[in-house]
């Protein structure tokens, strides 16, 4: 694939491997991942019955010290396939549990970074507080709930308007931020 997101992910994979880090690269489209959380699966998950494909994702997450998400922002949210992935994978009993009537995150001692591409102007997003809203809801809100306390994100804006040099600079920002976390 020749997308900007894939170029970011490839560079992150490269810098990680150069530092001797094992990388589990999950391209949801390439995997033909089914993002639908069925009622039956939800009921089974609550009984501790986990589908094989989801158990594999759980295993990858448990092995990870650093989780990196690279995705475009669509209508102020995750692309539907990523939303479905998170719905199915960050399940009760794996990502969080209920204890004394309260939710407790189970994915402790993990770091997360997110690189989010947007077609619009980044300054406008910040002016309207969209970056803060994203942080509260999608980024730290969701993943802190699951126990991941160290979550950082970078927004890359105007991706349809910038030239290749600007894209390369953004890719290197992602590489540098990854290098700092390894």
Residue map of PLM features:
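Hydrophobic/aromatic beta-strand patches that form the interior of the parallel beta-sheet core
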Residues: 24-26, 68, 113-116, 151-154
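A generic structural signal for alpha->beta connector loops
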Residues: 20-22, 109, 147-150
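Glycine-rich phosphate/pyrophosphate-binding loop and the adjoining helix
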Residues: 128-182
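Generic secondary-structure boundary/loop-capping signal
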Residues: 30-34, 93, 104, 140, ...
